């Protein structure tokens, strides 16, 4: 009789979908009130002027304007939205 030993089973073979985090609006871009600026885990970037922080640390614009990234402190960043100069 022909015999074939059973093959092992692989423990790989799964891959989760990415969570689409990151910067959604970059410096100098015009934004509307409510636009999401950054999706992040924790405050990698802090909210600045006219920027709100959601429950999951999502940063969003509170007014219509232009995005500006700023350094503050020794090694921290914040994002602000300033009214566009008409």
From Swiss-Prot:
One of its GO terms (biological process) is translation. Residues 1-31 are annotated as: Disordered. Keywords: Ribonucleoprotein, Ribosomal protein. GO terms for cellular component: cytosolic large ribosomal subunit. Gene3D superfamilies: 2.40.50.100. It comes from the Bacteria. InterPro entries: Ribosomal_bL27. The keyword Ribonucleoprotein applies. One of its GO terms (molecular function) is structural constituent of ribosome. The keyword Magnesium does not apply. Belongs to the bacterial ribosomal protein bL27 family. PANTHER family: LARGE RIBOSOMAL SUBUNIT PROTEIN BL27M, RIBOSOMAL PROTEIN L27. This is Large ribosomal subunit protein bL27. It comes from Desulfotalea psychrophila (strain LSv54 / DSM 12343).
């Amino acid at each position: 009789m022909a015999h074939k030993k059973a093959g092992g089973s692989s423990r790989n073979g799964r891959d989760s979908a990415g969570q689409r985090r990151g910067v959604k609006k970059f410096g100098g871009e015009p934004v509307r009130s409510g636009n999401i600026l950054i999706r992040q885990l924790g405050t990698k970037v802090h909210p600045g002027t006219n920027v709100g922080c959601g429950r999951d640390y999502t940063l969003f614009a509170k007014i219509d304007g232009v995005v500006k990234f700023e350094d503050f402190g020794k090694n921290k960043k914040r994002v602000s939205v300033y009214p566009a100069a008409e």
